[in-house]
């Protein structure tokens, strides 16, 4: 039984491109070794009329004892190694950020509230000690005015550097000593603080009549001492009460004036 060679195609079908190239190889190949050698295809299909014997070039067939793992029908894909690395890095970064935020919150709490021991000792001392004569006490007989209480800073807790900075309006210690530390004391912040006789308003604050505190505290003290003299004094004075916001604005204006006075004069570029 003779098999048809690749150079002689069968009569009933059209020769393929490979067969035509094999037949015309002598026209474009000069070496006889290359002409006599036939190149096998990369992937050989099933046994055909041109293959005298079957040859498995892709490896031995799988044994029946080791079946192939069937693919799961679910569309869920396994995560890639690089995605696992990115997920772990993101998780570690979030954990470190949360830890830093917790540390920062604890530091701020310690700065503004002090240590827990100081808070406990100050609360115990405030409950045992009577109220200071110049301090502010909440009225017990007026429950409807509880929502309108004036905010008074507590001075029992130890002051931190940030609190000293804000209490002294950001000024240097030398300038605070020159101006007088009593001007920046917490007692002067309350609504019942009144200017001392003989003191002049700071420079840059405007008229002397504007640098006045609320007359509510003075009216209360005068009313406790002398009856209706407080009402007569307030009617005779006729000055409006100064709010905390307006007082802070005047302090900022005064600080800005001090800064401009200390700095060199600026020339106008217009």
From Swiss-Prot:
Q: What is this protein called?
A: Protein FAM110D
Intrachain disulfide bonds? none
Record region (Disordered)? 1-83, 117-142, 186-244
Q: Point out the gene that encodes the protein.
A: FAM110D
Report the InterPro entries cross-referenced here.
FAM110, FAM110_C, FAM110_N
Q: Which organism is it from?
A: Bos taurus
Write out the transmembrane intervals.
none
Bias (Basic residues) ranges: 68-78
Residue spans of biased composition, Low complexity class: 1-16
Sequence similarity: Belongs to the FAM110 family.
């Amino acid at each position: 039984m003779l098999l048809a060679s690749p150079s002689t195609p069968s009569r009933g079908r059209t020769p393929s491109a490979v067969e035509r190239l094999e037949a015309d190889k002598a026209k474009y190949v000069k070496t006889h070794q290359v002409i006599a050698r036939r190149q096998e295809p990369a992937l050989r299909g099933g046994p055909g009329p041109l293959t005298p014997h079957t040859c498995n070039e892709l490896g031995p067939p799988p044994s029946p004892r080791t079946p192939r793992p069937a693919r799961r029908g679910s569309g869920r894909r396994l995560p890639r190694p690089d995605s696992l690395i990115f997920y772990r890095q993101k998780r570690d970064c979030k954990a470190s950020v949360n830890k830093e935020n917790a540390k920062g919150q604890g530091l701020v709490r310690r700065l503004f509230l002090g240590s827990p021991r100081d808070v406990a000792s100050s609360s115990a001392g405030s409950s045992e000690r009577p109220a200071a004569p110049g301090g502010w006490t909440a009225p017990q007989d007026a429950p409807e005015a509880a929502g309108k209480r004036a905010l008074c800073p507590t001075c029992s807790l130890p002051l931190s550097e940030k609190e000293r900075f804000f209490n002294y309006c950001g000024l240097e210690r030398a300038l605070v000593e020159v101006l007088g530390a009593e001007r920046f004391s917490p007692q002067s912040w309350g609504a019942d603080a009144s200017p001392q006789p003989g003191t002049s308003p700071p420079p840059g604050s405007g008229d002397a009549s504007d640098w006045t505190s609320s007359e509510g505290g003075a009216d209360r003290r005068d009313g406790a001492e002398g009856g209706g003299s407080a009402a007569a004094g307030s009617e005779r004075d006729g000055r409006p009460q100064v709010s905390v916001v307006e007082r802070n604005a005047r302090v900022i204006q005064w600080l800005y004036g001090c800064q401009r006075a200390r700095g060199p004069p600026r020339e106008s570029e217009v």
